[in-house]
């Protein structure tokens, strides 16, 4: 196991998001079951931490951008900086929605349509951000998620305000369409993994990659779909489960997503103005980590060890030739020794 290879593609931004969502879902399940009696402002603490890190990271990155104009000419620096600003704008709208949700739950004095208003603005902004991201070859997962769920946001707000009286199974029809697409993606990876396993022309590394992708998508999509079905059945009154068993599949999906962040790219380098990979940044701050980052473990059979211990004979060395005038030492390669040309005397005419 090579620790350097494990952490070189680590994505700290996504790891932070998934970790905060996992902790928030745990606290929310405990609060809904009455195990803890915290205020919802405290239950949303992981969400506040997530948004705080986004705001601080963007502020520091903007300060570094403003104080160092020479950085703007480095490759795709402008594209990454604009991507960071787009992400900050969307996160601020999400923060407004989350604050309104907490206020609505604690006081209950305004309509849910007003609470969901920031999400109604997020969706068109996310569509524009997705178009911009496709043009500049940027991956915008959060923006895509917000843009495709605009109809779902409207249905949920109308159902909570009792403007429509549909069962939750019907309200979540846009969600079922999205999950059907994700199930097709899982099926695609499974089929390709089987084909790569049966093919003899594919190297082992490609087989492992496709199998890992198939297992990862299965571990993400199947528990997530299970969680959504259990939650909808509970809201419709078809089961009497407590919230903790319902949230367990969601926790499994989030843990899998956290594990996948170790094999993805490092994300935007302008967060906190570090301008480099996160692991390289940590190694520069904490030099003692380099000793552990350079450790790798390699398991061999005994036959391989005996083969490695056998010394390899070195080729014979030929003594160097010296030229006195130029004072240059020339070392001849083994088996390619060439005699020097004979001395040529040129007589000058009288």
Curated annotation (Swiss-Prot):
InterPro entries: TM_Fragile-X-F-assoc. GO terms for cellular component: dendrite; membrane. Keywords: Cell projection, Membrane, Transmembrane, Transmembrane helix. It holds the Pfam family Tmemb_185A. It is found in: Cell projection, Dendrite; Membrane. Residues 298-350 are annotated as: Mediates interaction with MAP1B. Coiled coil: none annotated. It is a multi-pass membrane protein. Belongs to the TMEM185 family. Interacts with MAP1B. This is Transmembrane protein 185A. It comes from Homo sapiens (Human).
């Amino acid at each position: 196991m090579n620790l350097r290879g494990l952490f070189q593609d680590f994505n700290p931004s996504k790891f932070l998001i998934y970790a905060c969502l996992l902790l928030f879902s745990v606290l929310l399940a405990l609060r809904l079951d009455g195990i803890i009696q915290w205020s919802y402002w405290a239950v949303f603490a992981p969400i506040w931490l997530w948004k705080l890190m986004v705001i601080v990271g963007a502020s520091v990155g903007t300060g570094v951008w403003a104080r160092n104009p020479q950085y703007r000419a480095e490759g795709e620096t402008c594209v990454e900086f604009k991507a960071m600003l787009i992400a900050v704008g969307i996160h601020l709208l999400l923060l407004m929605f989350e604050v309104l949700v907490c206020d609505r739950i604690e006081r209950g004095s305004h309509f849910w349509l007003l609470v969901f208003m920031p999400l109604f603005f997020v969706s068109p902004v996310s569509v524009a951000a997705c178009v911009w991201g496709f043009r500049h070859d940027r991956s915008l997962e959060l923006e895509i998620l917000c843009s495709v769920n605009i109809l779902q946001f409207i249905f949920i707000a109308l159902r909570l305000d009792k403007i429509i009286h549909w069962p939750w199974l019907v309200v979540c029809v846009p969600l079922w369409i999205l999950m059907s697409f994700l199930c097709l993606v899982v099926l695609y990876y499974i089929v390709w993994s089987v084909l790569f396993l049966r093919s003899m022309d594919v190297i082992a590394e490609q087989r492992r990659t496709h199998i890992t992708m198939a297992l990862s998508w299965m571990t993400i999509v199947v528990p997530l779909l299970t969680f959504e079905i259990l939650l909808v059945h509970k809201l419709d009154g078809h089961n009497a489960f407590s919230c903790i068993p319902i949230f367990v599949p969601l926790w499994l999906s989030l843990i899998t997503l956290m594990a996948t962040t170790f094999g993805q790219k490092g994300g935007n380098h302008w967060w906190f103005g570090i301008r480099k990979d996160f692991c390289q940044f940590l190694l520069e701050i904490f030099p003692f980590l380099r000793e552990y980052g350079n450790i790798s473990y390699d398991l061999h059979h005994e036959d391989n060890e005996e083969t490695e211990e056998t010394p390899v004979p070195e080729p014979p060395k030929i003594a160097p030739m010296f030229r006195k005038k130029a004072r240059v030492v020339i070392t001849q390669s083994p088996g390619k020794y060439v005699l020097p040309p004979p001395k040529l005397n040129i007589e000058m005419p009288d």
